Amino acid sequence: MRRLPGILLLTGAALVVIAALLVSGLRIALPHLDAWRPEILNKIESATGMPVEASQLSASWQNFGPTLEAHDIRAELKDGGEFSVKRVTLALDVWQSLLHMRWQFRDLTFWQLRFRTNTPITSGGSDDSLEASHISDLFLRQFDHFDLRDSEVSFLTPSGQRAELAIPQLTWLNDPRRHRAEGLVSLSSLTGQHGVMQVRMDLRDDEGLLSNGRVWLQADDIDLKPWLGKWMQDNIALETAQFSLEGWMTIDKGDVTGGDVWLKQGGASWLGEKQTHTLSVDNLTAHITRENPGWQFSIPDTRITMDGKPWPSGALTLAWIPEQDVGGKDNKRSDELRIRASNLELAGLEGIRPLAAKLSPALGDVWRSTQPSGKINTLALDIPLQAADKTRFQASWSDLAWKQWKLLPGAEHFSGTLSGSVENGLLTASMKQAKMPYETVFRAPLEIADGQATISWLNNNKGFQLDGRNIDVKAKAVHARGGFRYLQPANDEPWLGILAGISTDDGSQAWRYFPENLMGKDLVDYLSGAIQGGEADNATLVYGGNPQLFPYKHNEGQFEVLVPLRNAKFAFQPDWPALTNLDIELDFINDGLWMKTDGVNLGGVRASNLTAVIPDYSKEKLLIDADIKGPGKAVGPYFDETPLKDSLGATLQELQLDGDVNARLHLDIPLNGELVTAKGEVTLRNNSLFIKPLDSTLKNLSGKFSFINSDLQSEPLTASWFNQPLNVDFSTKEGAKAYQVAVNLNGNWQPAKTGVLPEAVNEALSGSVAWDGKVGIDLPYHAGATYNIELNGDLKNVSSHLPSPLAKPAGEPLAVNVKVDGNLNSFELTGQAGADNHFNSRWLLGQKLTLDRAIWAADSKTLPPLPEQSGVELNMPPMNGAEWLALFQKGAAESVGGAASFPQHITLRTPMLSLGNQQWNNLSIVSQPTANGTLVEAQGREINATLAMRNNAPWLANIKYLYYNPSVAKTRGDSTPSSPFPTTERINFRGWPDAQIRCTECWFWGQKFGRIDSDITISGDTLTLTNGLIDTGFSRLTADGEWVNNPGNERTSLKGKLRGQKIDAAAEFFGVTTPIRQSSFNVDYDLHWRKAPWQPDEATLNGIIHTQLGKGEITEINTGHAGQLLRLLSVDALMRKLRFDFRDTFGEGFYFDSIRSTAWIKDGVMHTDDTLVDGLEADIAMKGSVNLVRRDLNMEAVVAPEISATVGVAAAFAVNPIVGAAVFAASKVLGPLWSKVSILRYHISGPLDDPQINEVLRQPRKEKAQ
């Protein structure tokens, strides 16, 4: 022990000497280290297994220890990468190393270190810990610290991209059990710079591992795309992923046990199917915890905005629990994935659907089809990854919505809860004001007003059971309540049971609830159109059986829906009229439908005992049977609303029934759109049948007819037609191009009792006619109807007293044939009466029957052609116009004019027409319309005239020639012609047109009147004559007047002038001899009386007459007809008296210079006081009155004889030179006598035809002196 200090001292001294020698050796050797560089590199290569290169090695010894500097170090890695350092500086502190017993460096700096590896950095590896390799041992344990300057690490990122990790500066400190680092790291790749991160690490080294500690990262606007896995890059079209973040990671015992991520700002974008989706975060935090042996990831607040829509505030937690040993038989519990979430908005997840589609294409397809939306309030899922059929769940949601996917109906406003597991669970659901589209099943979305349901299930080794309880749904027009149970035993057949009560307030909405996939399209088509309304309070749905065996052809199950519809509207065929106010029971049994009702209205008829059956949906046929009773007039309108409109309906339009009918109806209706078959029989009792083409009605129609669709066939029917008995039968046939109707008719009728002829015609007919007829009607399917009628009969037993040519005695055969061919627009009526009379006509059908053109040909052997233009042409035998006018005056033509419209162009030709007591020979009368009315032309032997019947102007009659000489014209005792108008009836000219008459040459009663003009104006009961004129060439009469034809106040007034140069010539033009010769005349008159113009009433005659005659002679005083004016004033009687008294003085004639007279008439008494005859032999002045009513005279006459050579002889010579000579001679002889007579006075009285003339005074001539 005593020698120990010495030994130690000696040892220490030796060590110091050795160390000194070593240091000295190093001082000498280190500068020459580069010379041993190859050997040193080979040694390193053999130790590492990698070839190492260096361009230079330099070293030196400092006070603290050696320093080393190496240049251009390069090594190749096993994965094909490389490691290189531009320069390494190393300064070893020997004394500190000895003190701490580990390497202590004053400086260890790597300049421009380049590390390139081809091995991708993945999340998995052979070991989860950071084990030390040779390099890690060197850098983590051998170096107490080191620095990296301008270095770079190149590696493959998880996405497969090569990334460059630039390290501008990094300092690493190593303690024996603690490792710390701090610096800047910049990541870049081929796509550009990805940001700069600050890195801090504080790790502890236990058992050779970096097993404990924390790592902190911080980066602003860093691109995370390179750090995402290759799967993400291959499957997600990620465009951007820029975030500002901080992160903490905790390492415990070499494993990552937790961490926190704080995403301050940033977002990502990726390309979807049709648009680019975006995600942004705002201070989103996430916490990762490793709870042995599982993991948990939680986001306490989802501060996420996707596609511009913020997520609602919620939380999300994911946990993975590894497989556990729980003991027992199955001592292993599968690893589980547990999910907890709240306030998830499904619509906000649409952006991640492409990710889901890549993870699970099936899930992506469902998501894309359903497009879910709504809110999941809470969600808890425990999913055993090795036994997913044992998943446990609990959830609640509100207002979920999705679109239909396959047989999953769409929904909206779907709220509810879910609890339990896949093996045993419970679902409660509710919907309000929601629509559930269910295409291929229902034709319209189910419109749910309020729905509640509770559904539970049990799924185990015995089978599957699904129960629905308290199902209460109020949908559009339907309220259903009930439940169901579905059983699927493990080794047995399934069974479904349903019991539900149903009510509806609108049966027309039933089409919404027919499952088309079960019932078939055609049946759903049919029922959708058939049920158009109704109510049901107690409908019942019952189902029991194996759904796979539906429709239970062998009664191994039952499906039945019994619906008692009330107030229903039901259309058994879509194109047929719907039945209304119907109480009908619908019984859906398996694949059939049975319907029945006690009674229903088919239009206006009643159907009873009605049944409608669809025995088998697959056969697609509806069978209907019913008894029908109702008014026949309602049958036609009913079929007009059916597909039989163009056939049976059109027939019933042409043949319209009225009265009650009884029928049996059977309908066979295919549901696939094929034609309906309708059969039945109709019984008629005292009905009526309106035949529209004939516009006539058969009454008291009795009999039967049957029908098959549009084909009708009747038995012999009896009826009454036009008040006459009739036998009729008819049939119809549906042809290839048209629907055909045939009617056979026959009877024996009395024409006078048919009720269709005017009464005046009936009175002229008697007897009966046997006839038969056929009516054929064609109703083309794509055109208008056509028809033909043929009637045949013999008028042998008929007696006619109608005017010729319609007169006929009984017993004389007269065959009649009438044919009609036409359509809905027109028809042609032709016929033959006897052998010589044919007629042809064309009629137009519109709002009123119109005769377009017609021709009647008497004495014709063939059918004459129709006129070329619209009009009527009558070629008649000799006719008695008076008889026809008398017949028409009795109203024979009134009904004809009201029932039809006739053309205005009418031509009548006859060899002789008796009218107005005159025969008009070879007469042709043509009436034709003009622009302003109608023009009538009449030509014949006795007339050539036109009458313009103008609409807005007076009628104009232009008569070129008229000869009217009635053969039986009667004259009065005074030889005046009779009136052309009847005297027994009052003439009413109200409504007569104004007229202008211009006659160039007129003859009346065999006498030529010459020119006759007149203008006639009608105003109420007043007829006004203006511009009246009769100009014979020898005399001219003008007249204006008025005829007031008021009953009880009739009045006629006329005024005008009568002029002429020679009164005897004017009189002789009419064949009358007048006693006045060579005298001009001028008469003005103004007369009025209270009767018709041609019936002057002397008692009411008033007026004034101015008469002036020029120089002339009065001869042959005893004149008759032409001397009325002289006789009226008794001039003729006075002359006779003078001739008698002075027969030696007066000769055969009396010459005068003038005759002037003014006479006024008052109530039939004519007065005059200035009648003056200025004669050559005497002057005669007369005054007094003539009573025209009593026809007597009361006149005074003064005769002043005068004979003067200067006056009288000169006047006589002026009148007639020969007479003047005689007067001159007489004046010489008679001068002494006349010189003694001065004045003669006479009083004339007595009857007008035999006046009494008494001389009152004969006054001698006084002397001149006196």
Curated annotation (Swiss-Prot):
Residues 27-1266 are periplasmic. Pfam families: YhdP. GO terms for biological process: phospholipid transport. Residues 94-103 are annotated as: P-helix. Residues 1203-1237 are annotated as: C-helix_1. One of its GO terms (cellular component) is plasma membrane. The chain crosses the membrane at residues 6-26. It comes from the Bacteria. Disruption phenotype: The single mutant does not exhibit growth defects but it shows a slight increase in outer membrane permeability. Deletion of the gene leads to increased sensitivity to detergents and antibiotics such as sodium dodecyl sulfate (SDS) and vancomycin. The deletion decreases cyclic enterobacterial common antigen (cyclic ECA) levels, causing changes in outer membrane permeability. Deletion of the gene in the mlaA* mutant (which carries a dominant negative mutation that reverses the normal function of the MlaA protein) delays cell death by slowing the flow of phospholipids to the outer membrane. It is found in: Cell inner membrane. Residues 1-5 are cytoplasmic. InterPro entries: CHP02099 (IPR011836), DUF3971 (IPR025263). The keyword Transmembrane applies. The keyword Cell membrane applies. Keywords: Cell inner membrane, Cell membrane, Lipid transport, Membrane, Transmembrane, Transmembrane helix, Transport. Residues 1121-1144 are annotated as: C-helix_2. It is a single-pass membrane protein. Involved in outer membrane lipid homeostasis. Likely transports phospholipids between the inner membrane and the outer membrane. It would provide a bridge-like structure that protects phospholipids as they travel across the periplasm. The phosphate-containing molecules are captured along the length of a hydrophobic groove that is continuous along all but the extreme N-terminus of the protein. It also appears to control, directly or indirectly, levels of cyclic enterobacterial common antigen (cyclic ECA), a soluble cyclic ECA molecule present in the periplasm. TamB, YdbH and YhdP are redundant, but not equivalent, in performing an essential function for growth and maintaining lipid homeostasis in the outer membrane. The transport functions of TamB and YhdP could be differentiated according to the fatty acid saturation state of the phospholipids, with TamB transporting more unsaturated phospholipids and YhdP more saturated phospholipids. Any of these three proteins is sufficient for growth. Forms long, thin, rod-type structures predicted to consist of stacked beta strands. Contains essential helical regions at the N-and C-termini, which may embed into the inner and outer membranes respectively, reinforcing the envelope spanning nature of YhdP. The inner membrane-interacting regions, particularly the P-helix, are required for YhdP stability. The C-terminal helices, particularly C-helix_1, are required for function, potentially in anchoring the protein to the outer membrane. This is Intermembrane phospholipid transporter YhdP.
